[in-house]
């Protein structure tokens, strides 16, 4: 990605944020500081006080595509679990400028290494990965984080087998027992939501799934062999 990464710092603790900004290389990071989180504002990373997150961002039905690092004043198990379940990172005070600078650098470096396209087109449809939304000629289809992760992996590897164990990695669930059956449930939901294109998700029984390039092609278990 060309140019410096945009980091939006949202807090009422201006000293911490200005000191952190001083530690970040301006050639690598462009920091803007404000006291209000604006959902429409584009940024590679939003660092925001939990108390300043808008209600809709905290709600379970909010879009989870925004990369947000949340700052907590104290540990609360329910809050921490909720944030993790929705894909947010968080830090708990005390937080120094050096700690915040290191967290920002680590977050953006890891996401650069594992970057995915912002959108993937299949047929007349466009899957907006970060927004967890598929735009179709009939309208918008909203996906859960797990459905989005599975569809992303299938489309990136279109026409190729995706093993069940790899699709399990896309399930956003912190339950101790995540079994192969979870993949089948999310696949069934995806097929319904994608309508006619749901039939492109082909089952290779006992092995995994693939997203077919050819809607007219019929697959069987023997069509793909593992090496």
From Swiss-Prot:
Result after altering residue 187 to A: No effect on DNA-binding
Key words of the record: Activator, DNA-binding, Transcription, Transcription regulation, Two-component regulatory system
Effect of mutating residue 101 to A: No effect on DNA-binding or dimerization. No effect on DNA-binding or dimerization
Record GO terms (molecular function): DNA binding; DNA-binding transcription factor activity; identical protein binding; protein homodimerization activity; sequence-specific DNA binding; transcription cis-regulatory region binding
Gene3D superfamilies (alphabetical): 3.40.50.2300, Winged helix-like DNA-binding domain superfamily/Winged helix DNA-binding domain
Taxonomic superkingdom: Bacteria
Pfam families, per database record: ChxR_N, Trans_reg_C
GO terms under biological process: phosphorelay signal transduction system; positive regulation of DNA-templated transcription
Domain (Response regulatory): residue spans on this chain: 6-108
Segments of the chain annotated as binding DNA: 117-213
Effect of residue 49 to D: No effect on DNA-binding or dimerization
Record-linked PROSITE patterns: OMPR_PHOB, RESPONSE_REGULATORY
Record's function text: May be a global positive regulator of transcription. Binds a cis-acting element of its own promoter DNA sequence and is hence probably also involved in its own transcription activation. The recognition sequence is 5'-WHGAWNH-N(3-5)-WHGAWNH-3', where W is A/T, H is C/A/T, N is G/C/A/T and the linker length in the middle is 3 to 5 nucleotides.
Quaternary structure and interacting proteins, as annotated: Homodimer.
Protein's recorded name: Atypical response regulator protein ChxR
